[in-house]
Regions:
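Acetyl-CoA-dependent GNAT
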Residues: 3-4, 11-81, 92-94, 98, ...
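Small/polar loops that bind or transfer phosphate-bearing groups
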Residues: 1, 110-111
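Flexible nucleotide-binding loop
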Residues: 85
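Short coil/turn motifs at beta-sheet boundaries
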Residues: 5, 102, 138-142
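Conserved active-site tyrosine of GNAT-family acetyltransferases
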Residues: 119, 124
Length: 153
């Protein structure tokens, strides 16, 4: 990811949240999640995390972020119009490979409710039930499921 990609990534994140999350989160929750990502994305683009994008026809359509130091998948968003076309699976496989090459034995994260089935199909397992996290924006609570996957060495 390049710093100049941030605006296009925000477009992808915004569409993924607005359309992909609407069956699991209300408008206020979706707005808080987007605001949280938007407020830190510029800083994170320059930070210690590894950001990866997927492109179709020269256009960014998906974004993921890996924190290899903690083996955490911090984000994975696919533009709503590209969901269900294998873009997310391909990007997740790329991130898993990067994590494995950096010595991560597992990959974990707090997964949104709309993405739990996606991660389960990819081999992740739930570490418990739903839990509520406070969004960094306006004190809104968001339900997530913590999941992890063991990676091949």
């Amino acid at each position: 990811m390049r710093f100049e990609d941030v605006a296009e990534i925000l477009r992808v994140v915004g569409r993924a949240i607005a359309l992909g999350c609407r069956d699991h989160y209300d408008a206020g929750q979706r707005a808080a999640v987007f605001a949280s990502y938007a407020s830190v994305l510029f800083v994170e683009a320059l930070g210690p995390y590894e950001a990866v994008v997927a492109e179709l026809e020269g256009r960014i359509v998906a974004y993921a972020q890996l924190d290899a130091a903690t083996s955490r998948l911090r984000a994975l968003f696919v533009d709503a119009e590209c969901q269900g076309r294998g873009v997310g699976r391909a990007l997740l496989a790329d991130v898993e490979g990067r994590a494995s090459r950096r010595g991560c034995a597992r990959l974990h994260g707090a997964m949104s409710l709309n993405a739990v089935a996606f991660y389960a199909r990819a081999g992740f397992r739930a570490l418990g039930g739903e839990e509520r996290l406070m969004s960094a924006s306006e004190g809104v609570h968001i339900s997530v499921v913590r999941m992890e996957k063991r990676l091949r060495a």
